[in-house]
Structure formats: C-alpha cells, structure tokens
Amino acid sequence: MSPQTETKASVGFKAGVKDYKLTYYTPEYETKDTDILAAFRVSPQPGVPPEEAGAAVAAESSTGTWTTVWTDGLTSLDRYKGRCYHIEPVAGEDSQWICYVAYPLDLFEEGSVTNMFTSIVGNVFGFKALRALRLEDLRIPPAYTKTFQGPPHGIQVERDKLNKYGRPLLGCTIKPKLGLSAKNYGRACYECLRGGLDFTKDDENVNSQPFMRWRDRFVFCAEAIYKAQAETGEIKGHYLNATAGTCEEMIKRAVFARELGVPIVMHDYITGGFTANTSLAHYCRDNGLLLHIHRAMHAVIDRQKNHGMHFRVLAKALRMSGGDHIHAGTVVGKLEGEREMTLGFVDLLRDDFIEKDRARGIFFTQDWVSMPGVIPVASGGIHVWHMPALTEIFGDDSVLQFGGGTLGHPWGNAPGAAANRVALEACVQARNEGRDLAREGNEIIRAACKWSPELAAACEVWKAIKFEFEPVDTIDK
C-alpha cells in the first residue's frame, strides 16, 4: 500500500477497540416519548464496571459491535444507537444492577414482535463480559403500539359473544392430556360442559398425534359443544389447539375450526413463535374466532431471577402479537407465581393504562392507547377450596381453569364441573353481598356444600391438598 493510499484510508477513522461506555453510556440523556425503554438486570463479570456492562448491553442490542468499524461514518450513530441512560444497584445484591436502556423507534419494524425481540434480546445474552442478564420490563410507546392489531377481539367482545357477564369464566383442561381417542376425548368435553363449565381445553402438547389426529378431535369436540349447548341453553367452547409444524398447517386447522362453527381456537405462542402467533391472531379477527394462548416453555425463559426474561415482558409481547386469553399462573396452585408480581402483569394484560409500580414489579408506566385487553387464565393445581382466593385475586375478567380439579371428582366429570360452578356462584354472590372472600372463603364454600352434594364430595377429596413452596422469582425488596 502506498503512503498516499494509507493516509487517505485513515482520515476520519481510527481502528481499534474502545470502551462501550464512551459511546453508549449517556446518563445525561432525556428519554423521548417515542423511545422503547428496557430495564435489564445486569450481572457483570468481576472487574467489569456497571457503566461498561450497561453500555455493552445498549451497544450489542442496537448499533454496536466489538470494534470500531469504518462504516460507522456512513450513518448517524447518534440517531440510531441504544443508550444506557440510568443505572441503579439491586437491593440486597452486591454484583447486580438495573440498567435502563432507551432505543430509538426507527430501530424496529412496525407490527413485528419478532423483530423487536431479535434486536433487544437476540444476541446480547451470550455476551462474555456478563455473567448473567435478564430483561425485567419494557416500555412500549404509543407510537409503536399503534402499529399492532393486538388481541383479535378483547375482553368486552368476548363477553358479548358468549353472553356471559358478572363472573369469571370456568374452564377445564382434558386429562390425561395424551392417549385418549378422539371420541373418548369428545365425550370428556361434553360431560364437563353439560356440568356447568364454559370451556374445555386441549392441553399444550395435544396437536395431531397417532392416537388422535387433529381433524377427528375437532369434529368430536364440536359435537360435544353443540350437544352441551342444546342441553344447557348456554354458549360453550373448547380450545381447539391449532398449533402445528408449519404456519400453513396451523391456518388450515383454524379454517376447519371456523367451518365447524366453534367459537375459539388455541395456540402455543412461545413454541409456535411470534410470527405464527401474529398470523393466527389476524386470521381470528378476520373470521370471528376467539384465540386462547398457552405459554408452554415460558419457564425456560422467565423462571430464573438473574437470567432470561421476565414473564411481564412475554405478556406485553403477547398482547401486541395477539391473543384473547393467556395463562398467567394462579398464585395459589402448583405453578410459580408471587401474588403482587402476578397481579402486576395481570393488570398489564387487561388494563388500558398502568402506572409504574416497583412494588408489583412494574418498572415503567404503560399506555396501551385503547388496544383490547387479554383475559388472564388461572390454571394449574387448583380446586374448589381455592375458589374464594381465585375470585378475589383475579376478579371477573378471568378464566379459572380446573383440570384435575374437575376430572378428579369421585363421581365423574359432570359432577366435578357442577361442583366448580356452584363454588364460583357462591363466591361471586358472597362478594357482591360485601363479604370478605379472603377471610370468609372457607365458610362460604362450606355453606354452599349444604345445597350441592357434588361440591361437598369435591371438598372432601381435596381438603388437604396444598402446594406450599416458596417462589423462585420474587420482587426485590
């Protein structure tokens, strides 16, 4: 290379490696209303300052890379870079910090949860300078929210479709989840629906296996729905799982469900993927189907406190991608979930405007600008003795789903469903009369047993069943 060429190449560009914090740590930055804001729990490697760690997260999840590149001069880094604008220590932890990062809106494709996550959590979580990294929360600005359709229908439209008001909805996951023939599966659905439930449900891993192909299941479940509706005079539904190996097959299953005239289908949104989920949500809105969402695989991502992504982020992403129901834990059942934290993301699913509230794990004020809400589903290890607590915790706009708590009734599925319906009606009536469900719950259930032998039998079976384990993921005190 001639000296002349060498001189020209070096003008305005100095090769080498420089600290991330020189470019991406900007504590003086004032966030914009259009920025996507992220709160990361950062655990740096020994010797890495929190400012450098936070700046590295901002850089590697936006415009930065490990070395200076000459093409930086071909764009405006100041316009497009992510910025770590605030750092605070985590209470009770010596080597963890909450690092706040602001991302310009131009970094993200409109209406794409897939692209948003690919940027914010796609690559940086494997960064060697960090021992662990967790995305605790996101603030989605109205300017980005309005590029999404959101839930196919929302809470009010669902209630109008079902003609059911003033109480939580009741559901049941059919068990055993695998191994039943389509006809026996449909029979189990029918017994639950005629007994008083609003919905029955495919479990997350019921797709189209050799023992029960999807088309056969759809037909027998539709028959169960129509027969139960004729007997009870109520609108019934079964969450027909449309999750499949390809998007094309998934849509084909949803089309068949619509042709059968059933009210609702289902999708496993994490294993199925956000692109598939958004496609299905659009189809459901266009064709009048409600969409139930299962969160299978979520705990792989959100269970550990110092690494991964909190479920409140997955819940926000689902509301944007689209779903009318989503499983949200129970607080009192067999699955992980602290009460205040669970109520925090339940509000993020249902409400239009949610204030920042660190006591409930909410790091940012979130304005959904009239995007429809999602109904939280409480499911997993719950039974009739839990009904007062569930009614008090989740309120009317929820689905309370009893799988074993229905099918495990000693007299069969229909009596199990009747027991749950009587318990729910008793709790709702007591609440409406001003009684304290948290304090008087057991008394309310015992009183209802006098009028319902099905409930009395259920109470006897599950009187000693408890799941008393401390949650792994808790709010920082």
Curated annotation (Swiss-Prot):
Site (Transition state stabilizer): K334
Miscellaneous section: The basic functional RuBisCO is composed of a large chain homodimer in a 'head-to-tail' conformation. In form I RuBisCO this homodimer is arranged in a barrel-like tetramer with the small subunits forming a tetrameric 'cap' on each end of the 'barrel'.
Subcellular localization: Plastid, Chloroplast
GO biological process: photorespiration; reductive pentose-phosphate cycle
Pfam family, one: RuBisCO_large
Similarity-based family: Belongs to the RuBisCO large chain family. Type I subfamily.
Binding positions (substrate): N123, T173, K177, R295, H327, S379
Active site: K175 (proton acceptor), H294 (proton acceptor)
NCBIfam families referenced in this protein's UniProt entry, alphabetically: PRK04208.1
Post-translational modification: The disulfide bond which can form in the large chain dimeric partners within the hexadecamer appears to be associated with oxidative stress and protein turnover.
Role this protein plays: RuBisCO catalyzes two reactions: the carboxylation of D-ribulose 1,5-bisphosphate, the primary event in carbon dioxide fixation, as well as the oxidative fragmentation of the pentose substrate in the photorespiration process. Both reactions occur simultaneously and in competition at the same active site.
SUPFAM superfamilies tied to this protein: RuBisCo, C-terminal domain, RuBisCO, large subunit, small (N-terminal) domain
UniProt cofactor note: Binds 1 Mg(2+) ion per subunit.
Residue ranges the record assigns to the propeptide: 1-2
E.C. number(s) listed in UniProt: 4.1.1.39
Self-association and partners: Heterohexadecamer of 8 large chains and 8 small chains; disulfide-linked. The disulfide link is formed within the large subunit homodimers.
Protein name: Ribulose bisphosphate carboxylase large chain
Keyword Ligase: no
Catalytic activity: 2 (2R)-3-phosphoglycerate + 2 H(+) = D-ribulose 1,5-bisphosphate + CO2 + H2O; D-ribulose 1,5-bisphosphate + O2 = 2-phosphoglycolate + (2R)-3-phosphoglycerate + 2 H(+)
Lineage: Eukaryota, Viridiplantae, Streptophyta, Embryophyta, Tracheophyta
InterPro entries membership: RuBisCO, RuBisCo_large_chain_AS, RuBisCO_lsu_C, RuBisCO_lsu_C_sf, RuBisCO_lsu_fd_N, RuBisCO_lsu_N_sf, RuBisCO_lsuI
Modification N6-carboxylysine, positions: K201
Transmembrane parts of this sequence: none
Entry keyword annotation includes Plastid: yes
Gene symbol of the encoding locus: rbcL
Known cofactor(s): Mg(2+)
GO MF annotation terms: magnesium ion binding; monooxygenase activity; ribulose-bisphosphate carboxylase activity
